[in-house]
């Protein structure tokens, strides 16, 4: 007898090692089943991930195999942890099981299966598999079932107690030992009852272990409350378990519908299998065999038990031991497990105890995984799909249709070299005698290769002109190909930008050598070197996959495609942009190829012709988009063709390196065919390399006929051969991609174009082609699809260097016509980066629709929204027919030129309306026709029924004509459920609110949207509130009236009736509540006075005295829910304020909001006052009807967008289409892919007109005859004048230069100082902690500024250094001098600088005893700035600071704040740090909470070498440390606070000894670090701010650890710290950017704050006097002219709206402009000014706003 057990835990081994071993074994031939399991599971997981909401999908990295996720994705954390734990707990044991070498035979009478938790589901995979071969598919479906179960549990957890996507996980399960099930259950029942816990949120038992231990489950917050308040259970031994996924084993939360949902997507062929003879699987709930005749019944039963039953392993053991027929007296019982398990040990013991004669032993089936003997990896192969392509080819073939037209017409487009390349007459000599000339004037050329849309690609005209046109055209064609492919960044798994590669072939640099090289400028390198061609594409599109530039001469582009296929097959990328580039601009290559007798003297390539005399050079740019076939099909891409095989070899046996070799070529074809599994006779067309050289053509025809059409056996079907070079020349590096594009067009058009250039007779060296059934098409040959036979094309591309590459293409798979989708109204979008392109794109789309008015509207909408990259200029229309769309688009043509660009995504608000306009059947159409919305409503309905409420579905699915009485209770419940579902729908579409507000009933949905209440809590509260109203209030005795009048007008007009103000929605939008009689009278009175009124269809007068009977019972119910911290700001109409945290809600908030007046208008006013919302905020109204649009517009003047979610008077599709149009037009990033996902398989990506570029000619003309002369005359050199001597560096802290280097790229200096030196040690001695010297971190400021000044003097000699800022400081360890000063103790300081000294990163390191290794102490960055501009900036709020300082002193005078003297300050400080007298600058201080001000007088410096003396910087700033370490607001018993760093330290004036300063700071808890505090320290001299330390941050440290952390390195603790550097201080959090930096380099530092500190040399500089000219002044005109000159843009084109990035101002050009402004306009700007100043308008504003400080 064999018992197989599957555990609910991972094996005790190293899990990462197990996954690694599974990967290795899966590649071995003897583990084919294991490999298939992983492949099938990967496919299933991908399918399920595709169905996840976008916010969850975005958490997952790209993966090629499920093992990639297991190894690289942290699935133990985050919201999907439970879901993927389900996946891997099923996958791991099954993989171990199928890998074992035993026979796969399990009979019912000899085999028994058991399992716990997810292991129970894993066991079903084996029980449901009739054979080993069936296991992979079965396992995949069990993993699907497990994943859906995990997702179901996650969804339920979110409904009950949601967690943020990046929040810490909390346990849902605790174990209680020593009490027993009965006692624990009594404690649980008592708690649930006494706290009125809603049933779905109740605490329950999930597991009872054999030893009596009990697992208790529940929402984490309630579980904590239970153990802190529940009497007996509280005192029992208990502990949380690592169960984070959510609630399971919960019969009150799940039923059979949930287990059916988990199983329903499994494949029918698996579910229908018969299990009548399968082995038994014992229930983990009671030990009884599961009764299942089919796999469907087995899966549903197992899932139901998992979701609803308590696990009782003891009952399973009892059931086994009680099965006497199974355990005969002398039977050998084999218990087979997958790695050791204590649970099984208990089973074996129980069997041996109950059946002493039974021999039971345990077998580990997983041991095989550790046997590495037979590991021998092999690879896999998948077809590669071409899904997009574009080209620029000779003869005007600037797009695919023009190319096809050229081919069909059989045109030969060779011509003389055009004048824009070079002077063909002077550079051509047909005799070949003249030096460096070509013997042919002919070539094939792209028209105007300089045309480029520089603004689209964020390049200046200057940069564009200096950039090789091949690079520019590569950008254009790459975009066009991507657009044709429907690429949208990160839309799907295979379009994740980090997984997209760029690979291009290129073999010449004509433009660099002959054009740009004539006058080398700043963009010469990035604009022309080959690596920048694919690199520029990757950079622009933000692709992070492999980027290669390939040069294999003439075969470069097809070699690039082959490498791209390999990259995809190996899983190194999921999508690749590939192609070839060749633009001929210089005569050198013409001359060289002529001398080598490659080129034809007579014209184009005479392919196959007996008179062929060489090839004709040609331009060519081609780009294609590649994906694996499975990914392309998954993404609903259009497949243009399939690459079945690709290979490259080398003709090493040829007679010379440039000579072809037919046998090698033939071997290549065979290899490619074998790889693809295709017979040679199935290939109907070979697109040959066919250059028109005698040797090349003869060798290729020999190899082709030998393989594809030998004499014996003769082909039955004709083989056709052709070569595109006869049309457009030999594109060299672009030749292969040109041939490939031609082949794909042949598939598309189902015909073969004629071959041209057979001027004389067929090449006499060819065999008899007719006899071999080989044909050269001389006319258009139809080549339609044939049923049962696929079409194949072989594409050849050979290299003059000997390389040969071939691709085998298969026709694209046929696809049925689109079926459309149930939507009745669709959004169509057009966008561009310029108004010129916008108009042209609009015209192009209109032309397309007029030519094909029967195009599928749904597919048109899908293509223009979900399958397009959207730009800042947008036209958005919606309609129900193509005719309506055309009409709307035509109306937009006239206004397109005035369209405003979207500068940034707007803030988004959700407004949740009340109940006032409820009607039955709300959202019925959306429910019936849009599955995601239906799923959400059904999920919420389950919550309703779990609370004991009636189902909401009848009220939603009923029609208005149906006779269905909707109770007030149901109306409220439906309303809030619809709002929650709509909120989730909008969020799934990428519409994430920044702020939410709800009116009346809508506030409950707003609390859900803000994250403070769960969906379950909201439904429970609304349902209970509605129940109380029905029970305690009289229906229809009171009513409500909406009035368009002010409160004053109403009071003046209505004097004889009793009423209350229920809602004040706007200045003239008020809702009254009163009895029905009074409401009727009031209505008549107001109407008679001309006021607009509307009586609301509500059964109660909400927010009035009618509701008072429910308040106290409802308040008790409301206290049973838990308010969580908000994730989104909430505007509270009750509080008339904005709420940012849950502490702002008073205990009676829900009670008060039920009765209190809805102060909607005041709340919205408050939100505007604090800047949270404005007229640009985009609002989405979420409710059963559009009722709050008027109120929003009344409260926010000039509000632009309020988009409703539903309207009762129109189709749901119409409402949503209009709203989505408005949102998209406003710049909201809608997830259109998610919107169309349910219907995507029924839609098609349309081949619409491509993007219409705003082209301008950017071209450097080649001039002169210097290429002919090649002048090599030597030039005399010159001596550089010696650089001025740098200033001396020796100071107390900076000792000697260890190394330095300076050059054109900047400089580096390394300083080494001895800490035990007397001067250095004296600095440390003035600042002691735990009685030990510790160098003040503010000493680093002096070091930084001294080194920065030195570097500035070396790099910018003769240029005055104005002011410096030392910022981005992060302190990792303290610098503590040794006790033993007999030996040196070194510290090293490294500083780097760019050539402009705009950023000078510094890192400080302790040198270890071996003097080889170092430990990092701190990092920071010095930047240069303008002290006068800081002074002006600070002046704007000086009065606020002085007012606050005076207020603090008044509080101290009143005894409300603490005033402390100097002596007391430093007495208090001694508990943490003991300052020497010269550090004791604070004379007195006032502390109030976390706020303080100190009077400071600085001690004089004895040493004149200081730049920023630490005994000045420390006392002027340590008021923040005083608050935290000595202030009354903090508990100092167990914690001290030490310096973490600061973001910026700058002073406009030098600090002077003896002067009185005031330091003010308010410390606050740091947002991103628990326990940290930060604040801005302001330093005032008089009433003027002269310094600021921004975001000075202190971190907590347990006081008990002071001795350890501040012991000298040569003490016991200090030596331990040196051995373990990471413990020198508590580790800096991972997410602090500077803390990640191991070596401070310019590229690693954040340069967003280029600010500085004043130095003594410039502190007295006076600003320029006089008024500053306005924006039309000569200076502004000079500034515009300078920018125009440097960018190459016409001055008139630099309008106020022009963005600097759009004209190519990048980091490099920004530095150039800053330097030019300083030199030519005498204006000093920060190095990143033009990166941080968006446009010309902002530049003008800056010039005007800084008129007194610019110089």
From Swiss-Prot:
Residue ranges of domain PKS/mFAS DH in the record: 1295-1603
Observed effect of gene inactivation: Impairs aflavarin biosynthesis and leads to a reduction of sclerotial production.
GO biological process, one term: secondary metabolite biosynthetic process
Keywords: Acyltransferase, Phosphopantetheine, Phosphoprotein, Transferase
Pathway note: Secondary metabolite biosynthesis
Cofactor or coenzyme needed: pantetheine 4'-phosphate
Segments of this protein annotated with the region Disordered: 1610-1670
Active-site feature positions: 554, 689, 730, 1327, 1514
One GO MF term: fatty acid synthase activity
SUPFAM superfamilies tied to this protein: ACP-like, FabD/lysophospholipase-like, Probable ACP-binding domain of malonyl-CoA ACP transacylase, Thiolase-like
Region (Product template (PT) domain): 1291-1607
PROSITE patterns from the UniProt entry: CARRIER (PS50075), KS3_1 (PS00606), KS3_2 (PS52004), PKS_MFAS_DH (PS52019)
Region spans: Malonyl-CoA:ACP transacylase (MAT) domain: 910-1228
Induction: Expression is induced by the developmental and secondary metabolism regulator veA.
Enzyme class, UniProt record, top EC level: transferase
Tissue specificity of this protein: Expressed mainly in sclerotia, with expression levels 20-fold and 10-fold greater than the expression levels of this gene found in mycelium and conidia, respectively.
Comp. bias regions, Polar residues: 1612-1657
Protein EC: 2.3.1.-
Modified-residue entries (O-(pantetheine 4'-phosphoryl)serine), positions: 1707
Chain spans, region N-terminal acylcarrier protein transacylase domain (SAT): 19-249
Tagged with keyword ATP-binding: no
Annotated spans, C-terminal hotdog fold: 1456-1603
Record remark on domains: Multidomain protein; including a starter unit:ACP transacylase (SAT) that selects the starter unit; a ketosynthase (KS) that catalyzes repeated decarboxylative condensation to elongate the polyketide backbone; a malonyl-CoA:ACP transacylase (MAT) that selects and transfers the extender unit malonyl-CoA; a product template (PT) domain that controls the immediate cyclization regioselectivity of the reactive polyketide backbone; and an acyl-carrier protein (ACP) that serves as the tether of the growing and completed polyketide via its phosphopantetheinyl arm.
Record-given protein name: Non-reducing polyketide synthase afvB
Gene responsible for this protein: afvB
